[in-house]
Amino acid sequence: MEKIYNPKHIEESLYFFWEKNGFFKPNHLEKSTFCIMMPPPNITGSLHMGHAFQQTIMDILIRYHRMQGKNTFWQVGTDHAGIATQILVERQIFEKEQKTKKDYSRDDFIKKIWEWKKQSSNIITKQMRRLGISVDWDYEKFTLDPDISNSVREAFIILYKNNLIYQKKKLVHWDSKLETVISDLEVEHRLIKGKKWFIRYPIIENDMSLRSKVKYLIVSTTRPETLLGDTAIAVNPEDYKYNQFIGNHVSCPLTNRIIPIIKDRYADLEKGTGCVKITPAHDFNDYKVGLHHKLPMINIFTFDGRIKSTAEVYNYKGEKSNQYSTCIPMQFQHLDILSARIEIIKEITKLGFLEKIEECNVTVPYSERSGVIIEPMLTNQWYLKTSTLAKVALNAVKDKKIKFIPQQYESMYSSWMNNIEDWCISRQLWWGHRIPVWYDDQKNIYIGQNEKEIRQAYSISENVLLKQENDVLDTWFSSGLWTFSSLGWPKKTTFLKTFHPTNVLVSGFDIIFFWIARMIMLTMYFMKDKHNNPEVPFKNIYITGLIRDEFGKKMSKSKGNVIDPLDMIDGISLSELIKKRTNNLLQPNLSDKIIQRTIKQFPEGIKSTGTDALRFTFSALASSTRDIQWDMNRLKGYRNFCNKLWNASRFVLINTQDHNFSKFDVKRKMLLINKWILIEFNNTVKLYRESLDTYRFDIAANILYDFIWNIFCDWYLEFVKIVIKLGSSKEVYCTKNVLVYVLELLLKLAHPIMPFITETIWQRIKLIQNISEKTIMLQDFPEYNHKLFDKKILVQMNWMKKIIVFLRNIRTNMNVSSTKLLPLFLYNINSEQEKVIKENISLIKNISFLDKITILSEKYDKDLCIKEIIDGAEIIIPILKLVDTKVELKRLVKEQKKTELNIFKIKTKILNKDFLSYAPTKIVTQEKNKLLKLNEINLKLSEQIKIFRNMSYKK
């Protein structure tokens, strides 16, 4: 095995070896199964940290269950990501050709996207392979594959025929740049400085004496441009000021439209004037008021965000109405919305309708996709009824058929589902699943897989022109079918029968409603068990936290804090990293700031750590918290951990390569250290498996780290070196046998988290053990053996270790070189302890650099000594002749002064209110931890100074 651990030399070739030999494939169909559906990443770019994190977690689970002999299947695929992909390709086409989507036919534009998709998918799959994910690539799916598209159309048809899908004109969030409806959850609400305009609405009523007293109702609004679509003024029924006006009418400024004054509790007595203009076609709250009072709805905006030349008037049911005129003043026609606002303010000021203007803060909705202001728009869309579906999905979680891990996310899920509204499933895009609806000239609706099927089913002749619906389905609709459409539904395939329902979904809390809830609803509607009961899509939902930067900030390109997982695996120079972070910025003015931040954070670029170190870091950070702060120092530390395992394995291989250890009997007679390591490993297996079984990957990583670094390397290997050097031939052979046996099991234990390094080492170990199988990933995972537990062995070994630690501390604290051999005296030891000393005397002497070990029958009072009671036994080290007390005392006093100065500095800092108020929480915590450590050091220094002063006094 190579002397230096170099992950680059082993990882890519090893993945090719795994894939070529079909080790990732599901097999043994008669065995128990374990299946995960990978949340398909969007094809819009490369994998980010969140993808790498979640895919690592999923791969750990798949490898773990595969090694338990289960028939594992991990569905891999990518999502067509309708809006995001169309935006990206439109932008690229404009940059290259100065053309827009409208310069192409629909088919030609879609061809452009397919060309781009091939390029993007190759990047994503390459990244996945570098992460080591063990998926069967022969079953890779794309959400626009023909079989998936067939499933999506079939689902739509069934839902429509069962009266769960309908078409209706409703108010939606409209993106005027993309010219499509977007989800409520894709709207970002920003608080900005704005204005409130107070506008006079002339009162129209028969009582002229009343009119002479009050001529206007004054209404405040932050959107004066929408007054062109007003259909009522609302006042609160408890507002006595306006009771006399309820049932009367006002004239709408600029349009002279006569609209009613209505009573509704939506009008807030404490806000504005108490009067609210109601524009049902352009405000969500107004829309609800309009439905309640059966008000007309007047649409005044075009889909691209301009004032229409002719208004559209509908009744509250969304049907065309002639209740009001469709005329819009000519001077406002075709203006964009903000320009129209300016012109309308000018006109109402000129005509005397403006009362006053006030500065205020306004919450404005923006599209997360395009960045433009969202307009509430009255449009004809397709909807899925959700109330019945949601009830079944809610009960599945309540009845524990589906469990959230951590459990805290159940309440988030329940809250959303209890307040769910019908789902708008149509989008005004070209890229996506085109809705399987056709219309004839009379606007009759026909539903089917394709036009040919429809003509046959409805007996429509070729002479009748049929036109397909232009809209596509919301991306989340096809994604909601993912757990069963990817397995072949509606066909009853072997894979569908074998792997559904799946075992666990690994996802983020940010898409619990977007995707997870909808998946549960749709799956339980379409999938039924043998008793015709709704089948859940998965039994467990493991929700990961969100990966943030070291300061707790969300990673984004605009902040310049994004890290590509592959850049940590393979390394990247500073210049390349800067280029990557500043390329294609939406806000180029941020470039200098991002460059400076990058230089400060990574002055030498990012060094290669390899995949296993990255995967181990992800595992160690996978706690149950909502936010996870990325820590490059931990990544570096786990790179060192991989190196530690590599070097330890080299030591084992170098010392055992000439042997054949095909059999091992744990019951054979052996040294205490060998019995102990077997028990420790057995306990580690128990705790490790419990952690993986309960999705505590962070605990599993810490257990593995502690065993490899502290128990196996720092203790056991140090003992083994002495046995190999000084032990009898039987002791040496047995110890080497145990060494190989434990390492081979340890590699299997670590394999799910660290697949590359463990496979590489195992390929060497298997030769020594005469193992014929090709790969570690198909080996049996270590199991806990309760018969191996022996408390007596642990007590004996722990006592011996405590003595060794005590001796090491004396050398460290008193600055005694290892070349100076110490005498050790023991007093008041029991028979078991005496047995441990006698049987392991050579080990203890050599590991602690002792010249002799003496068991006393009487107390030791001859020389100045350090004594320690360890498990009832008195451990004695004479120290009078070990060191120059004056020199050592001087050194200790100097060290203490330095420590006390540092304590003073940190205390001053953490008592400073400004520091506590403005410093990041992480920095404050670090300073407090430093203080605790310095106080511990200072206490030890005081104890040592006291000892040496006593020694000087006795001399």
UniProtKB/Swiss-Prot annotation:
Biological processes annotated in GO: valyl-tRNA aminoacylation
Free-text note regarding domains: ValRS has two distinct active sites: one for aminoacylation and one for editing. The misactivated threonine is translocated from the active site to the editing site.
Residues that, per the record, bind ATP: 557
Motif ('HIGH' region): 41-51
Record's subcellular location: Cytoplasm
Motif 'KMSKS' region, residue range(s) on this chain: 554-558
Designated name of the protein: Valine--tRNA ligase
Coiled-coil ranges per UniProt: 926-946
Family per similarity comment: Belongs to the class-I aminoacyl-tRNA synthetase family. ValS type 1 subfamily.
PANTHER family (UniProt xref): VALINE--TRNA LIGASE, CHLOROPLASTIC_MITOCHONDRIAL 2 (PTHR11946:SF93), VALYL-TRNA SYNTHETASES (PTHR11946)
Keywords: Aminoacyl-tRNA synthetase, ATP-binding, Coiled coil, Cytoplasm, Ligase, Nucleotide-binding, Protein biosynthesis
Gene Ontology MF terms: aminoacyl-tRNA deacylase activity; ATP binding; valine-tRNA ligase activity
Catalysed transformations (reactions): tRNA(Val) + L-valine + ATP = L-valyl-tRNA(Val) + AMP + diphosphate
Subunit (UniProt): Monomer.
Top-level taxon in the UniProt lineage: Bacteria
PROSITE patterns on file: AA_TRNA_LIGASE_I
Broad class of the protein's primary localization: cytoplasm
EC code(s) of this entry: 6.1.1.9
Function: Catalyzes the attachment of valine to tRNA(Val). As ValRS can inadvertently accommodate and process structurally similar amino acids such as threonine, to avoid such errors, it has a 'posttransfer' editing activity that hydrolyzes mischarged Thr-tRNA(Val) in a tRNA-dependent manner.
The keyword ATP-binding is annotated on this UniProt entry: yes
The keyword Nucleotide-binding is assigned to this record: yes
